[in-house]
Amino acid sequence: CIRDRQVMDLGAVAHLATIAGKLPMLHFFDGFRTSHENQKIETWDYDELKEMVDWNAVKAFRERALNPVHPHSMGAAEQPETFFQHREACNTAYLETADIVAEYMDKVNAKIGTDYKPFNYYGAPDATEIIVAMGSVCDTIEETIDYLNEKEGTKLGLVKVRLYRPFRADKLVEAIPSTCEQISVLDRTKEPGSEGEPLYLDVVAALKGTQFHDCLLYTSDAADEAR
């Protein structure tokens, strides 16, 4: 999230998707920006939010909660052979959450006229070079793209990652213009000793076997060497 309004909008998406998907969700945003500036925004009406709540999921959540009236165990110890299977089995629920998040983004878009997606594209429709990034840095990148495309005739674009986990490779590929030849990935973290940072490695894996497989890929620690 970049601006106060986006924090509020996507905060609603995170809460609604958590209820429907039965999984906790981490909603992160630029805390410095939102706490050091004033913006006029139209706040959500609770009745509008109430219309989008899955009340059957809320009821099921309350029934699953620890309660002495209907006791059950949670977090029981397991042997390695069964724990491994259960950890793999739960991955399905995480993958399904991506569709739930996209569904609530669409509902929010319909109500307030926004265009939130798991991956939003900004820039020239026929861009040859794009950046993949997340967070408040996208605001600066957008301004730079506008200037360079208008003043210097470049064809640049930006893919903004709004949903990082679960990472939907197909949604990323859909967001990239078919004319793309070079991709630079800006990560939010540094992992010394790793072949690459998390977002970069996700992008590499997502593009494998697609029309963008031969695109030049760059990351912050390999600016002078295509990978």
PLM regions with names:
Residues 1-2, 218-227:
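Single conserved hydrophobic/aromatic residue that forms the stacking wall/gate
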Residues 9-12, 36-43, 142-144, 170-171, ...:
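Short acidic, glycine/serine/threonine-rich loops at helix termini
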Residues 25-120:
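Conformationally flexible catalytic loops at phosphate/diphosphate-handling active centers
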Residues 100-116, 133-141, 162-168:
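A general structural motif
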Residues 126-151, 167-172:
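Redox- and metal-dependent alpha/beta enzyme cores, enriched for Fe-S-associated oxidoreductases
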Residues 160-169, 182, 200-209:
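Metallocofactor- and cofactor-centric catalytic cores in central/energy metabolism, strongly enriched
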Residues 194-205, 216-220:
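Phosphate/diphosphate-binding loops
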